[in-house]
């Protein structure tokens, strides 16, 4: 097993969605007390969940919602009831702001999400310091930059890219590598930039770099042809599971035998509708969670019992978000009926002090709100994630 402790860079990767120029006004979201936050019983803490529940990225949002619901049940006590309400943002920044406003009207006191990076950047860029925001999977440094109450459970782009390059330097030092990424996506390009930087330092042999601009692309034959002609034996592609499934099918159709390596966004590849999962055999990916790991057996069983499916990393990340919020509430010793700004400030201070044994590892947070936890590489074998 390859295990790297996170050391977080301060490189500033720009989030394209942050510049979406939203004209939607973000409502103030002070909660608690007379402003409608905690329920009248004084024990209910209202937590919002924002993510794509419909659309191309729905797997991420729906999984996160399910994981958060399980955690709310597990971490509620006789003195603290964690109440959840979800809103769909279709992985869109402007819709995420609308969802945030809707949850504010409900009386939200803390936010799990948004799930995708662009939406999270949009909300965190507008959010005042009167709301604790813990995103399960948004990875850009811009999500938490200059924010006092915003935290990430997912690795940052620099951490993920550098970790992947270090793994390849240790395990695949002789590989001829093609770098393949979505230049129009904040997450994909951010990880790719960090990978390229660390690859140079680690003296990896990158023989080709190919890009695309749309996750709905139906063919990568041109890019794969160039990678094959360059002699690439391994493709590092920090892309989402849908384009990854297309890439693997295209490679098979053209007789290109190579190893594909992805990152956490590729988790979900085995569940793509109509995808021949045998094509995923031997795929490498960096992810903090494996449903096949014995230490996660209780969670996996509870998830399967509740939803009749196997949890992915996004479900585990969201579970850890709610776990962290519950731990922060306990650590801060707050009165959940107090003013929302006071709650957020106290919870943010507590978040920087707590350490939780989460599903995705041992989690702590630095002053910038970025998570520090180990990154692990897995290989897909017979439909299971095996430590690489």
Task: Give the role of each language-model region.
Residues 1-8, 16-26:
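N-terminal secretory signal peptides
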Residues 38, 60-66, 74-144, 153, ...:
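Beta-alpha junction/loop-to-helix N-cap segments that form part of ligand/metal-binding clefts
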Residues 96, 153-176, 189-191, 217-221, ...:
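Hydrophobic alpha-helical segments within soluble ligand-binding/sensing domains
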Residues 150-211, 234:
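An alpha-beta-alpha
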Residues 248-319:
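Extracellular/periplasmic periplasmic-binding protein-like sensory domains
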Residues 306-315, 326-387:
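Segments of small-molecule ligand-sensing domains
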């Amino acid at each position: 097993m390859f295990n790297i402790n996170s050391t977080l860079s301060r490189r500033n990767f720009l989030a394209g969605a942050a510049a979406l120029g939203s004209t939607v006004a973000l409502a103030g979201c002070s909660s608690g007390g007379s402003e409608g936050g905690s329920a009248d019983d004084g024990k209910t803490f209202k937590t919002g969940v924002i993510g794509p529940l419909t659309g191309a990225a729905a797997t991420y949002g729906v999984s996160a919602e399910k994981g958060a619901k399980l955690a709310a049940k597990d971490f509620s006590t006789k003195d603290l009831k964690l109440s959840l309400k979800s809103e769909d943002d279709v992985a869109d920044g402007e819709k995420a702001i609308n969802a945030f406003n809707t949850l504010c009207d409900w009386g939200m006191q803390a936010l799990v999400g948004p799930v995708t990076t662009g939406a999270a950047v949009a909300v965190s860029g507008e959010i005042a310091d009167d709301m604790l925001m813990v995103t399960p999977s948004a990875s850009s440094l811009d999500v938490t930059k200059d924010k006092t109450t915003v935290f990430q459970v997912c690795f940052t782009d620099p951490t993920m890219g550098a970790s992947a390059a270090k793994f390849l330097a240790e395990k695949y030092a002789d590989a001829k590598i093609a770098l393949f990424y979505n230049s129009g996506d904040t997450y994909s390009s951010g990880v790719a930039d960090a990978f390229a930087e660390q690859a140079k330092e680690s003296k990896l042999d990158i023989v080709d770099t190919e890009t695309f601009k749309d996750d709905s692309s139906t063919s990568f034959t041109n890019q794969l042809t160039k990678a094959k002609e360059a002699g690439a034996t391994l493709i590092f592609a920090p892309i989402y599971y849908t384009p990854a499934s297309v890439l693997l099918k295209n490679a098979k159709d053209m007789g290109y035998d190579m190893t594909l390596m992805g990152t956490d966004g590729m988790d979900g590849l085995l569940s793509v509708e109509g995808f021949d999962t045998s094509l995923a055999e031997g795929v490498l990916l960096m992810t903090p969670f494996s449903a096949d790991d014995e230490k996660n057996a209780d969670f996996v069983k509870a998830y399967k019992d509740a939803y009749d499916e196997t949890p992915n990393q996004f479900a585990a990340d969201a579970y850890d978000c709610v776990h962290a919020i519950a731990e922060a509430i306990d650590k801060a010793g707050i009165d959940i009926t107090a003013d929302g700004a006071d709650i957020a400030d106290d919870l943010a201070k507590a978040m920087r002090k707590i350490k939780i044994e989460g599903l995705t590892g041992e989690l702590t947070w630095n002053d910038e709100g970025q998570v520090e936890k180990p990154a692990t590489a897995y290989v897909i074998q017979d439909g299971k994630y095996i430590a690489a």
